[in-house]
Swiss-Prot record:
Native organism: Thioalkalivibrio sulfidiphilus (strain HL-EbGR7)
Similarity comment: family membership: Belongs to the RbfA family.
Gene name per UniProt: rbfA
Database matches in HAMAP family: RbfA
Record protein name field: Ribosome-binding factor A
Cellular component terms (Gene Ontology): cytosol
Matches recorded under NCBIfam families: rbfA
Superkingdom to which the source organism belongs: Bacteria
Key words of the record: Cytoplasm, Ribosome biogenesis
Compartments (UniProt record): Cytoplasm
Length: 129
């Protein structure tokens, strides 16, 4: 059964595709390097769009990239308006997506807890076999 997509999801997907191309091809800011757009959440009235992105690097590189994207938001919005047929083009708000880092931290904590449990109860592994 096909999934029903709301208009905001379709617009968000289109904005993500267009922004990815614009950032890669048109944006000349040296602070914005290898950026991956993780997702776009568009408000119901299509007035605002949160653009989630990831970038490899240090905290300083992340801050620089965020600033570069925020400063380019007007240019990117104007270019989106030229490429998409929308009555109003959403204002762009860029947010760093740290879910991968949080997931890696949680995974490491789980691995550590399992290793500690096995170290405290080594005979339990033999009983399960």
């Amino acid at each position: 059964m096909p999934r029903d997509f709301s208009r905001t999801e379709r617009v968000g997907d289109q904005i993500q595709r267009e922004l990815a191309e614009l950032i890669r091809m048109e944006l000349k800011d040296p602070r914005v390097g290898m950026v991956t757009l993780a997702g776009v959440e568009v408000s119901r009235d299509l007035a605002h769009a949160k653009v989630w992105f990831t970038v490899l690097g240090s905290e300083q590189q992340i801050a620089d990239t965020t600033e570069g994207l925020q400063r380019a938001a007007g240019f990117l919005r104007r270019e989106l308006g030229r490429r998409m047929r929308l009555r109003t083009v959403p204002h762009l708000h860029f947010q760093y997506d740290d879910t991968q880092e949080k997931g890696a931290r949680l995974s490491a904590l789980i691995d550590k807890a399992v290793a500690e449990d096995r170290a405290q109860h080594p005979d339990d592994d033999e009983d399960r076999s």
